[in-house]
């Protein structure tokens, strides 16, 4: 039990140091005399509580907001990296997010069968969106890849052949003296 308490306290200290320069949290900390980490944890708890109780349907917009903003941030960061390791994770996320958005067309039926759907959706989306959890990789290897390999075969040759033909035509045009 002490290990979990130590881990939680270390996480709170990490939040305090990570958000040390945030002016809004500094102002709240000065007014309430609470550490920044308590304010952050409290705001996150209220956010999840609003999603959980879904008063006036606010759970849907809050769930979709967090499901869009956090992965968008990671996607913008991934566009600036040279490696493709984060691309698979983010593409998997956006496939799942799109699938859930299409399924939610029948949201009244979903809410009838799954009363806390928006809360579960938010937790699941955070699980697959945050790279350190590795949820997107698990969803990709267990669900998406087997399904797509079986039902959506990708034909590699057609696009490659077309690219080769275009390149050959461009080279022929250059060789014959064509210039812009």
From Swiss-Prot:
<keyword id="KW-0472">Membrane</keyword>
<comment type="similarity">
    <text>Belongs to the DP1 family.</text>
</comment>
<keyword id="KW-0256">Endoplasmic reticulum</keyword>
<feature type="transmembrane region" description="Helical">
    <location>
        <begin position="58"/>
        <end position="78"/>
    </location>
</feature>
<comment type="subunit">
    <text>Oligomer.</text>
</comment>
<feature type="topological domain" description="Cytoplasmic">
    <location>
        <begin position="128"/>
        <end position="180"/>
    </location>
</feature>
<feature type="topological domain" description="Lumenal">
    <location>
        <begin position="56"/>
        <end position="57"/>
    </location>
</feature>
<dbReference type="GO" id="GO:0005789">
    <property type="term" value="C:endoplasmic reticulum membrane"/>
</dbReference>
<feature type="transmembrane region" description="Helical">
    <location>
        <begin position="36"/>
        <end position="55"/>
    </location>
</feature>
<feature type="topological domain" description="Lumenal">
    <location>
        <begin position="106"/>
        <end position="108"/>
    </location>
</feature>
<comment type="function">
    <text>Required to generate and maintain the structure of the tubular endoplasmic reticulum network and the vacuole. Induces high curvature in membranes and causes membrane tubule formation. Involved in membrane/vesicle trafficking.</text>
</comment>
<feature type="transmembrane region" description="Helical">
    <location>
        <begin position="89"/>
        <end position="105"/>
    </location>
</feature>
<dbReference type="InterPro" id="IPR004345">
    <property type="entry name" value="TB2_DP1_HVA22"/>
</dbReference>
<feature type="transmembrane region" description="Helical">
    <location>
        <begin position="109"/>
        <end position="127"/>
    </location>
</feature>
<keyword id="KW-0333">Golgi apparatus</keyword>
<dbReference type="GO" id="GO:0000139">
    <property type="term" value="C:Golgi membrane"/>
</dbReference>
<protein>
    <recommendedName>
        <fullName>Protein YOP1</fullName>
    </recommendedName>
</protein>
<keyword id="KW-0812">Transmembrane</keyword>
<dbReference type="Pfam" id="PF03134">
    <property type="entry name" value="TB2_DP1_HVA22"/>
</dbReference>
<feature type="topological domain" description="Cytoplasmic">
    <location>
        <begin position="1"/>
        <end position="35"/>
    </location>
</feature>
<feature type="topological domain" description="Cytoplasmic">
    <location>
        <begin position="79"/>
        <end position="88"/>
    </location>
</feature>
<keyword id="KW-1133">Transmembrane helix</keyword>
């Amino acid at each position: 039990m002490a290990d979990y308490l130590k881990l939680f306290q270390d996480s709170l200290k990490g939040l305090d140091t990570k958000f040390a320069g945030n002016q809004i949290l500094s102002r709240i900390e000065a007014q309430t005399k609470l550490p920044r980490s308590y304010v952050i944890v409290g705001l996150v708890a209220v956010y999840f509580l609003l999603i959980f109780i879904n008063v006036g349907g606010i759970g849907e917009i809050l769930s979709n907001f967090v499901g869009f903003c956090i992965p968008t941030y990671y996607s913008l960061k991934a566009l600036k990296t040279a490696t493709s390791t984060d691309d698979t994770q983010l593409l998997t996320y956006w496939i799942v997010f799109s699938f859930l958005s299409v399924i939610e067309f029948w949201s009244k039926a979903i809410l009838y069968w799954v009363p806390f759907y928006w809360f579960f959706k938010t937790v699941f989306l955070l699980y697959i969106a945050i790279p350190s959890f590795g949820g997107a990789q698990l969803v990709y290897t267990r669900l998406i890849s087997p399904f797509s390999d079986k039902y959506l075969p990708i034909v590699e040759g057609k696009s490659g052949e077309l690219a080769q033909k275009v390149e050959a035509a461009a080279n022929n045009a250059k060789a014959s003296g064509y210039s812009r």
